[in-house]
């Protein structure tokens, strides 16, 4: 019943292939970790468009069903079954997305040991702030995913209810109200998550442009 857009982390415009060898500086190793994190999040990024398309289709199905009368119960049941399949597909994408983010989070965890090895105090402080932002981002994504799955559970229950001929208006309104409340949570978390992602991207850009960071990579 609503559509959300999720921000993604951006990679470096130009990246030297360094590979974290024994001779790599902490700065080089840190950049490798950050760019590998982008790679790990790629499946998550790729899931966004099809997920949004499914959300749009579900919205259309919902509006069509709500426009039908009880005399068209066969059509309501047919469309509800289609909507239930839509819910299952969205759940699959969310699960793939979460797997991608879990792997990215695990990869990014390596950043900490390289940040601790940075010699420049100001650079280290900047990198620690970036790390804190990314950790907060992953925490928000976990909350967002949990809330979105609650929405899908609510949607599934709704379309199962709509297939019943003895469904009352009171039951329908109660379920729709419950789903809308969860959507409000998703919307709020989505906004916070996108803000945190943009904050991380800016922090990463600033870190890469820091002269102390560039010097140690040369």
Regions from the PLM with identified roles:
Residues 25-28, 32-35, 71-74, 78-81, ...:
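Primarily heptad-repeat coiled-coil rod domains in cytosolic scaffolding/tethering proteins
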Residues 1-8:
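Bacterial N-terminal signal peptides that target proteins for export
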Residues 16-19:
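C-terminal motif of bacterial Sec signal peptides marking the signal peptidase cleavage site
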């Amino acid at each position: 019943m609503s559509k959300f857009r999720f921000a993604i982390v951006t990679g470096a415009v130009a990246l030297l292939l360094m590979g974290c060898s024994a001779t790599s500086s902490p700065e080089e190793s840190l950049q490798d970790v950050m760019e590998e994190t982008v790679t790990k999040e790629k499946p998550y990024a790729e899931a966004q468009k099809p997920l949004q398309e499914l959300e749009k289709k579900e919205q259309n199905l919902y509006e069509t069903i709500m426009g039908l009368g009880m005399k068209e119960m066969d059509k309501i049941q047919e469309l509800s079954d289609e909507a239930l399949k839509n819910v299952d597909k969205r759940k699959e994408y969310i699960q793939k997305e979460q797997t991608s983010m879990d792997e990215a989070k695990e990869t990014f965890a390596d950043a900490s040991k390289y940040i601790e090895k940075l010699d420049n105090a100001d650079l280290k402080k900047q990198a620690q702030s970036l790390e804190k932002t990314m950790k907060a981002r992953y925490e928000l994504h976990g909350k967002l995913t949990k809330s979105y799955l609650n929405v899908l559970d609510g949607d599934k229950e709704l379309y199962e209810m709509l297939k019943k001929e003895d469904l009352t208006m009171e039951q329908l309104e109660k379920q729709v109200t419950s789903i809308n409340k969860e959507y409000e949570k998703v919307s709020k978390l989505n906004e916070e998550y996108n803000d945190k992602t943009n904050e991380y991207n800016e922090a990463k850009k600033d870190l890469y442009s820091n002269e102390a960071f560039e010097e140690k990579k040369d």
